[in-house]
Amino acid sequence: HWHLTDNEAWRIEIKKYPNLTTQGSYRGYNQKIPPFYGSGYNKYGGYYSQDEIRELISYAKKLNIEIMPEIDLPAHSWTLLQVMPELREETSNIISEDVGSYKNNTINPSLEKTKSFLNDVLLEISDLFTFPYIHVGLDERPNNSWEGSPSIIHFMKQNNINSQEEFQDYYMNNI
């Protein structure tokens, strides 16, 4: 699979959300994403345009290779949340940390704006790639990432969901 997003960057052009790449694919001093892992203070990074992806898919097809895109969700979304903080509930007072030491890197799939965003992004990606599946990660979500979320607590009560794991399963089955 082709890992196109993670905590560190957003590497695929989504036409409906251009800030994902203009702000989320570069890091450096005075950038939305600060320098990581020795990348230095100069602006560094980049992304794949949809035309470049189509070209790569076409080339891979000639070699009998299929490409499965991966958009890492609901965790591993630190960069996404720097660009679109509204995808995480502001009233949540929990500070969660993942295995890579990124704090608060999990989107809130119970929010309508998050559902709309996911629908838009996954539709653009499914129109772009010929592979029948999109890998959405679902790994390494910090255990307490949704504990303080009033909207998730409310959603879980309304839908008789008893744990964050069950909520994640529900989310996965409905995106």
For each predicted feature, which ranges?
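Gly/Pro-rich turn-and-neighbor structural signature
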Residues: 119-175
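Aromatic/hydrophobic pocket-lining residues that form π-stacking "cages" and hydrophobic walls in ligand
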Residues: 56, 67, 175
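Helix-rich catalytic cores of soluble enzyme domains
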Residues: 66-70, 85, 115, 122-126
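Aromatic- and acidic-residue-enriched carbohydrate-binding clefts of CAZyme catalytic domains
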Residues: 8-62, 77-116, 145-166
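Hydrophobic faces of well-ordered beta-strands that scaffold small-molecule active sites
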Residues: 2, 60, 67-71, 134-136
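Active-site beta-loop-alpha junctions enriched in small/polar residues
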Residues: 3-7, 72-76, 139-143
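Proteins with a high burden of low-complexity, intrinsically disordered sequence enriched in S/T/G/P/A and R
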Residues: 1-4, 110, 167-170, 174
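A short, terminal or domain-edge coil/loop segment
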Residues: 7, 20, 63-65, 122-133
